[in-house]
Amino acid sequence: MTSTRKRKKGEVPIVIPSMGRPDLLNTHKVMLPERLDICVPDSEVEKYQKAHPDLFIVGHPDSVKGISAKRQWIYETYGDVVMIDDDIGKFACLEYAVGEKSRFLDPTAATSLCDRLTEEAKQFGVYLFGVSASAVPHYYVSGLPYRTWGWVNGGFTGLIAGSKLAYNTEIASSEDYWISALNAYHHRKCLIDTRYALVDVFGNGTMKTKGGMSFTRNLERESRDIEILQRFFGDAIKRRGRMGVAHQIHEHQKMLEIPWAKMM
């Protein structure tokens, strides 16, 4: 079953990929729930509807397996779309200091951010857009509110229809690196609003929580993802050690180093 709902002009589809954890769904609490499509396998639609009768549940074929295939199905089905993780607890605005009330967006502002960035991406002529990968104030540079190159974190992935982008279903859990590198190859630029970032409710626990990517994400698959990424994109994909205040979660963490970004 696919989405047939009508949207007002200027409203981008906001899709929440989820699987196997209706009880852990949280993003609808920090956005306008009536704007969200919760995308789950067909076999789980009834379970999600029972747990969340007020939410709009969209089913995809059970044959669509893995986060890469799921994102590809969503992109092909919706076209212009913003995909947001199902475990988001807060939308942070990094222009405000820690402790300030305005640091976190209310549901209306969080939802409007998706619409605004979609329109800005179209005006700028990019196909991939997102927000900062970290809510740590240390990383925010006030003089660089937008970045036009780099890695777009999968927690907030915005795509515009008509691109040369497609997900590689061999990739188990690094699909955001794949799509960011492929975008750099084909389209050169993206749009990242560094003033905003997502805060999930579990911290760095993807491999420890149930459902979702925990079904496929483990150190062996992370290592294989790096091999696949390096096969296609060479030394633009590097293993990441301890860098500054960054916390190394596991040995197979990676980074995308776009060659021409060094000159900017």
Model-identified regions with their sequence ranges:
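C-terminal catalytic/acceptor-binding lobe
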Residues: 6-13, 20-24, 171-173, 177-264
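Short beta->alpha connector loops
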Residues: 18-23, 64-65, 161-163
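Short acidic, S/G/P-rich loop/turn micro-motifs used as interaction or catalytic elements
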Residues: 19-23, 45, 88-91, 136-138
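A short acidic (Asp/Glu
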Residues: 25-27, 48-50, 92-95, 139-145, ...
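Active-site-proximal specificity loops/subdomain of glycosyltransferases
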Residues: 39-84, 89-106
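Conserved catalytic core of nucleotide-sugar-dependent glycosyltransferases
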Residues: 91-177
